[in-house]
Amino acid sequence: MELDGRTIFHVDVNSAFLSWSALKLLEEDPGAVDLRTIPSGVGGDVKTRHGIITAKSIPAKKYGVQTGEPVVKALQKCPQLVLVPPDFETYRKYSRALMEILARYTPLIQQVSIDEAYMDLTDRIPFGDREGALALAKQIRDHVREQLGFTVNVGISVNKLLAKTASDFEKPDRTHTLYPEEVPAKMWPLPIGTLHGCGKSTAQKLQLIGINTIGEAAAADLTLLQSVLGQKSGAYIWNSANGISRSRVEPEREQAKSVSNERTLSEDITRDNYQTDGVPVICMLSEKVAGRMQKSGLTGQTVTLQVKSSDFERYSRQMSLPDMTDRASDIEAAALLLADKLLNGPDGLFESGISIRLIGVGVSRISEKQIHQMDLFEWANRNEEDENARRAEEKARRAEEKARRAEEEARRAEEEARLAAEKARKAEEEIRRAQEETKQRAKSARQARLDEMMNKVNSRYGSGTLKKGNKKDNNQDGN
């Protein structure tokens, strides 16, 4: 069957991290305020006023709070903003629960991040049965809301690209369609930066040549796009703008010699959004790899982190662990360390201005798990690993504290500059007053000398004589 004859859903959780944090708080205290109903956000620390916002509520959005901005800036916009720390363990729990529900409708599921997945429902919804597709989407939304307590958007189309775009339309708890004939009206008027797979740097390059909307990219000459973006990227943008995508929904498959997962990102990852968009994906992929290994009774020792750039070039780093493992925490720690070196290091991709469109995590040197009693030496090794992890966490904390102090020093420097400017203004004002007083004293002195001269004249000739003489002189001047 041709791809255009398929029925594809894209399911996306509304404000995932914020919703899941709210649900956890309500589980712990049913009388607690629902974070989704008040100005709130995930990330950072309200006491230290450092960190960034990784998720926000709809009420917080009304104050202009934005995902990815510093906490201190968000609190300036909304002083009553309630902040909670991220809890990836809770997020993984709700993510797994969501995927279990989706799996009841079809086995053809491709999870692309911790809070979104594609579903191929062609076998369940015959092509052309659009009313049936809408009804099933509502059923899925209701199922998730009633059983798990949060809401999702569902986008429907004939391919993954259009389904993903549709799910990003009005939120929350909505179903949207974007069939090929709807593309000109629904997708083409959108800003070019909203096109799936078009990152910030790509959008800026297109805007420089006058392409500001998706429709303008769709109507552009393909060779022009390729000359600006490169052969592969130019073709990708042109096809995407015209709603063309041949990417299939690809369920997870076990691999014999390694276990890996990779995800194409909804937008390019740069240094600016790595913490908010990149780290959660790496954590989710590590969890998925560990889950598959545990399910199959496997352990592994080499962790690989792989990325694909916006120009479709692949880069990877790998490291071997001291021991075989199937633990998500071990895989995640190694993957994050590799990502930090590959992306954020002095010679990292971000330093070179390269953005990332795909992330993959894998474990190799696989073997079947051996069940045995852990001896004293293994306990010592594990304790040493825990100590190393603690030290790494402490190092990260010190780095964050250093950044906070730098921010505070910058703030003090700014305040000192303001005070210096105020001092200079006051000095200038004092100089102006002194000049004014000098002028006034000079004027008074001149007046005093004039009065003294008048007094001398009057005392010598008499005041009446002077006035009469003046009158005579005036009459002479008038003749």
Predicted segments, located by residue:
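Short, charged/polar surface micro-motifs in flexible loops or helix N-caps
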Residues: N14-A16, V46-R49, S310-E313, I366-K369
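DNA-contacting surface of Y-family translesion DNA polymerases
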Residues: E2-L3, H10, T194, T202-I356, ...
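Gly/Gly-Pro- and Ser/Thr-rich, intrinsically disordered tail segments characteristic of DNA damage-repair
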Residues: M1-Y236, E387-N479
